[in-house]
A protein has these predicted regions:
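A mature extracytoplasmic/lumenal domain signature
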Residues: 53, 120-122
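C-terminal motif of bacterial Sec signal peptides marking the signal peptidase cleavage site
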Residues: 24-28
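Bacterial N-terminal signal peptides that target proteins for export
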Residues: 2-17
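Bacterial lipoprotein signal-peptidase II cleavage site
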Residues: 30-36
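Short, surface-exposed binding/anchoring microloops in extracellular/periplasmic proteins
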Residues: 36-84, 172-175
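A short tyrosine-centered beta-strand micro-motif
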Residues: 112-119
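Extended, polar beta-sheet/loop recognition surfaces of beta-rich domains
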Residues: 48, 123-176
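Extended, well-structured beta-strand/loop surface patches
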Residues: 22, 62-111, 123-145
Length: 176
């Protein structure tokens, strides 16, 4: 014999299931970060990618037009390290081949009033690097020996800061 659940009990059950399905659908899988991406400049003004690997490895980096909509992100450059980057600091020029790097997509011309994001990744999506967003105006304010990156505070907040390379090496992996 079948029994019909009472209205309030049934509604609570349906509400709980709907909430669970909603949470599962909206909680995207993210790749854990274990590195920090930044930008710098060479003495002759060329844009540098800077990567501080904190504990595991990073295989490459991509520069894209920053967008909250994944479908609107356009890759403007991508590089693969000849060997996985292990804990420590790595730099490479973005506009031309650099020793130890292969351009899998050569850098396209960057344009004013566009925000770009540089991030690091692994081939198997096991690790990533926190990205840095920047504009050409941000790039133009950089001086050689300085790195712009997103610093993560003790409470988890992020803010773009510019520091010396030595300070970047010392502090970038804090709060990871």
């Amino acid at each position: 014999m079948w029994s019909t659940p009472s209205g309030p009990v049934f509604r609570r059950f349906v509400g709980a299931v709907a909430t669970g399905v909603s949470l599962a659908a909206t909680s995207g899988c993210t790749v854990p970060a274990d590195a920090v991406a930044g930008i710098s400049k060479t003495a002759d003004g060329r844009l540098l990618g800077v990567m501080m690997v904190c504990g595991h490895q990073i295989d490459g980096a991509t520069l894209s037009v920053a967008s909250d909509d994944v479908d609107k992100q356009v890759t403007v450059g991508s590089w693969t390290a000849d060997r996985p980057l292990t804990p420590g600091l790595a730099t490479w020029t973005l506009d031309s081949p650099a020793a130890g790097w292969t351009a899998t997509r050569s850098l396209a011309p960057l344009t004013a009033k566009t925000t770009y994001a540089l991030y690091g990744w692994t081939k198997d999506n096991s690790w990533s690097a926190n990205s840095i967003s920047f504009t050409l105006a941000d790039r133009d304010r950089l001086t050689p020996g300085k790195v712009r990156y997103d610093s993560i505070s003790d409470n988890g907040g992020e803010s773009a800061i510019t520091v010396s390379i030595a300070e970047f090496k010392a502090k970038a992996c804090q709060n990871m």
